């Protein structure tokens, strides 16, 4: 595969930013199979954002002949008070995450954080070296990577999180670091501090954050108003009514989407239209809306922008849009839903 085709795969939606594209081009010119990673905390049920959209981007990397690694950050999970800090539960849910990504992204490697720490002799030395370049105020500003604000009552271990995530990247010897836009701060920190230590600086690729089905919100997680809305509104397993999990049946998907925020004639920050653009159009070349003939009959789109324009012009009714979205989402989720139909751990999440 030539370099331009590989670059096009990386640039493809849901990618929103590459830091920097010229550096990525050079990597493809000089490294036969670049090494990628995306790090994930282990918590509740995987959903349309955390597995499907993320998995689509991982598959783009795999198709671009990149070695892809999913880093399951079990110690970060513990530090961030997920899964009640129960190590047995963290281990069980890690197995579920591992199976899900291996099923949805054939060829991906899964790395456990605790295993890496156990086998790396240099990790904690590098942690101290990196942290010597971090001020307390800079650490506090970076806490949005774990969904925390400076105003929260934090324990000391949570202040270790930004340095740990950065040194994970160093220890894994990566060419490409990949995450949602909510992790941008840590990648910019890496770009600033790694050169001071003489460490390899990886390219950062940030993908779109799929919003939950509720009305957009702003929690003050970052100074940038647009980014704050994107991060605050992202689909989250902590808000099950606003999140479409990979285990939801057809009825649950329809019910959740029908209750979703989708104001008439408003295309901006519309979660239904975002699901269509970033999830459905990634897999389907055409999006068909079924309508009674008295309302104009069925209509099909091959371009999400054209659909958004028609919706803004009130040519499409919200319920018609939602019904079509539910139908396509169910098709996408069905194979992995069936794959996990006998996994009892899911019932406890």
Place the predicted regions along the sequence by residue:
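Short glycine- and acidic-rich boundary segments immediately preceding or forming the N-terminal edge
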Residues: 1-19
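N-terminal catalytic cores of NTP/NDP-binding nucleotidyl/phosphoryl-transfer enzymes
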Residues: 14-81, 177-190
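Short acidic-hydrophobic, aromatic-tinged amphipathic segments that line or gate anion-handling sites
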Residues: 15-20, 111, 244-246
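Active-site beta-loop-alpha junctions enriched in small/polar residues
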Residues: 41-43, 75, 115, 209-212
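Divalent metal-coordination and catalytic microenvironments
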Residues: 47, 101, 232
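Short, solvent-exposed polar/charged micro-motifs at secondary-structure junctions
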Residues: 48, 119-126, 213-218
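Divalent-metal (Mg2+/Mn2+/Ca2+)-assisted nucleotide/phosphate chemistry catalytic cores
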Residues: 80, 86-206
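Conserved nucleotide- and phosphate/pyrophosphate-binding catalytic cores
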Residues: 166, 184-349
